[in-house]
């Protein structure tokens, strides 16, 4: 999963290099092997979150940073954490059903996961879902 996320980030950085060249990524990703179904859904969610941060979060941020983390607990629950140090999002903006939010919702449902957005020195996203037997 770590190498997949690195490739994904490199592709997104190349696409948006003209918008924010100071952007730094912090990865805290356990060695996790996921099936293509899980990896694709997480990749799509990650892409939407990073794209949103790059486009909207860092206008007033001198040293923009995005943190991405994955961990699995003893109950086989994968937790995906995403945060940026941008300007955050007003609660009412999180309720809007723009395309990015719909995609995040669709892929989270595909994973049968529970997710939440919140502000904590920027936008934060947390997704929990159970890795089914034989599909990790």
Locations of the language-model features?
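Conserved short strand/loop->alpha-helix "switch" segment adjacent to the catalytic nucleotide/phosphoryl-transfer site
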Residues: 17-50, 54-65
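Glycine-rich/acidic phosphate-handling loop/turn and adjacent ATP-lid/helix
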Residues: 76-101
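Two-component histidine kinase transmitter core
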Residues: 87, 112, 130-135
